[in-house]
Amino acid sequence: MTAQNPSDQPSPTARELRLANHRLGAQNEKLTEALKASREKLAEINSRLADMAEPPSTYGTLLQLNGTGKTAEVFTSNRHMRLAVSPLLDRTDLQPGATVRLGENLQVVEVTGFADSGDVAAVVEVVGDRLIVADKLGEEAIVKAARPLQSLITNRELTTGDSVVVDRRSGWAFHMIPRAEVSSLVLEEVPDVSYENIGGLSNQIEQIRDAVELPFLHPEIYRHYGLRPPKGVLLYGPPGNGKTLIAKAVANSLSKSMGSSDKASRFADSYFLNVKGPELLNKFVGETERQIRQIFERARKIAHAGKPVIVFFDEMEAIFRTRGTGVSSDMESTVVPQLLSELDGVEGLDNVIVIGASNREELIDPAILRPGRLDVKIRVDRPDQEAALDILSKHIDASLPLAADLVAEHGGKEEAAAALCRAIAEELFRRDAAHRYVTLHLADGQTKDLYWADFVSGAMLANIVDRAKTFAIKRALSQAASTRDAAAEGGLNTADVLDAITAEINDSENLPDTTNPTEWARISGHATGRVVDITLAD
């Protein structure tokens, strides 16, 4: 067998050549893509190696850009340095107070914005483009305001008492931050409570209107007679009788009166700063005093805008106790003088008045209650039967769903509502053995019987009405379920209000504090002498 000569093999056809060429082209493209991917991977690795080899950057605070823009004053590593600025940087980005990144040769190479973290300090005073700030310990420092604060200063949105982020080392303040502490303690609003919403306190309302509203509405007459408006009003008396409601109604009435008065047309509204007294207490020394200063600073700021401001301290005895009576601390020895200085400072303002409310007026420091500070003292006592009817009429009226038989019996919804009010008042104000609550045993051997009528309050009456409404709703739901009629007739009836009175009395009958009967009697408004014991009715 002879070997075949290669030249004797048949030549490839044109089709075979085209297929071979296509295969070679595809292989070439794959090799090209692989080479490109390898180059990109190599470039990425080289970039990472370069980043790892790059020396660490230093950051600093730009103090100022010098005249030519080629150098800048920078505070870095606790040193004030003059450094070169990269020519690649836009000079408009180099704002004083901004944080800058420094290159290997301490050249400014990047602007990273303004610091959003640091120490928190309170603004004591705004001096041009600088601020006097104080920390929690009261240490003051003067810092420059960065660009984010400049517009706030220009628009007078940054004032004394506001909190800012500062860097004490570089001497800059960067941002204003909201302080929840004082905002949560103070409710700044125009209340929606009017005198018409308050029942049984017509005498007290007249007194406080004379003390508060007249000086605001007729300042020229007061000046003509040389009479200074009172700086403050104390509302005191047993709990639950409308002290806070009166204070809110004053602010609401002032807002309406000022808006409609031609002589006071510049007043658009009034402000009611409702200070939650016990929450002012703080374990850190000086914090309570600082918050009081901020509250009055806010009042002054609003008053300077020409708006009447009422600063209302609820539970006043909690923070302004008589000095020297503290058991575990002497906090009142500094808090009381702080309030006294603020009250005396209000003298130069025409639009600020302080209203305090307390159940324990005997615990408040006498210096606060003297004339010239809280001038007017109004006792808000428990309602009698007539006042109770007035209060009840605010809660039960013809707009409520009333039982059809009750309406038919009295000839109309208004008459039926009045009948329910009378039923509650007559039941509560009975003075017989069945309605006796407690017997007070006095130190001199005498005894004094107290009835439920002696403990009626506006809050108690409102609660009785709410209970009665609950009973009526539950009965209506039960009737609707049994009759499968969602519109089943219901409505408030006499049985509901009488059951509500019984439930209220049953819930309250074990509440008297027999461990300290004298204090309980005083808080309840029945301090007739030293009480040595309390006996509950059978």
Curated annotation (Swiss-Prot):
InterPro entries: AAA+_ATPase, AAA_ATPase_domain, ATPase_AAA_core, ATPase_AAA_CS, NA-bd_OB-fold, P-loop_NTPase, Prot_ATP_ID_OB_2nd, Prot_ATP_ID_OB_N. This is AAA ATPase forming ring-shaped complexes. Belongs to the AAA ATPase family. Keywords: ATP-binding, Coiled coil, Nucleotide-binding. GO terms for biological process: modification-dependent protein catabolic process; proteasomal protein catabolic process. One of its GO terms (cellular component) is proteasome complex. It comes from Corynebacterium urealyticum (strain ATCC 43042 / DSM 7109). HAMAP family: ARC_ATPase. The gene is arc.
